[in-house]
Amino acid sequence: MGEVLLKLPSKEEQTKIASFLSAVDEKISQLTKKHELLSQYKQGMMQKLFSQQIRFKADDGSEFGEWEGKELHQIFQIKAGGDIEKSSVSEVRTSEFSYPIFANSDKNKGFYGWANKFKYKEAVTVTGRGNLGIAVARNEPFYPIVRLLVLLPLVKQNLKFFEEQINLLDIVSESTGVPQLTAPQLSKYKVNVPSLEEQTKIANFLSSIDQKIEVVAQQIEQAKQWKKGLLQQMFI
């Protein structure tokens, strides 16, 4: 076998490189900790908001009314996603295939591909297979597949509010074998419903935390990509 020659920098340069990379690693560690703390803060606030330990007030300073306990079928019409023809699906978004397809997955919010048609305009979807009970507010026309559960509000509701509250529910599978959740099973779960105005205040507050979490997540990814690029340049 032939010899492999390694091009090594001087010890002084090696020390500078190691120090610089350590600083980048420390930055990534700090951002990761910040992301964890923000996520924990959101979780804690959700518990307090949905248990009504913390209440918002109306814009005029008055107190909102009492929340009303309801089963989900009293608030939503619940349907299940089905199949879609292969000819109606594209992996790439185009002017024709412009509607997102969502399936039963907790990755990338269940995104599957693009369709040339939609089934529902706005709804909350809930995973009914695998990792059960993950709710996502869908605020644009979409097509659900693979038995993804779709909650269509009977009257005007804030979808983000119900996304967050459903995600706090302890949803368990009633079937043996592969975990699954059916529309009739989901319909019996109970939630507490405030006025639409209070729903919106809670949803906006939680969305503001989500935005901060997303910014930090992007910063972490950018720092990791930057480090990767630096390493590639250094050792070419």
Segments and roles (model prediction):
Residues M1-G2, A103-I166, E174-V178, T182-L186:
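A short beta-sheet element
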Residues V4, I84-K86, F111:
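Short Cys/His-rich Zn2+-coordinating modules
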Residues K7-K70, N192-I236:
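Amphipathic alpha-helical coiled-coil/heptad-repeat segments
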Residues K11, A58-I84, E91-S105:
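Non-catalytic DNA-recognition/assembly elements of restriction-modification systems
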Residues L49, F76-K79, I166, M234:
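Hydrophobic aliphatic residues
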Residues I84-V89, E174-G177, E221:
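A short, aromatic/hydrophobic, helix- or strand-capping loop or linear motif
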Residues E91, Q180-A183, K224:
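Short amphipathic alpha-helical segments embedded in low-complexity Lys/Glu-rich regions
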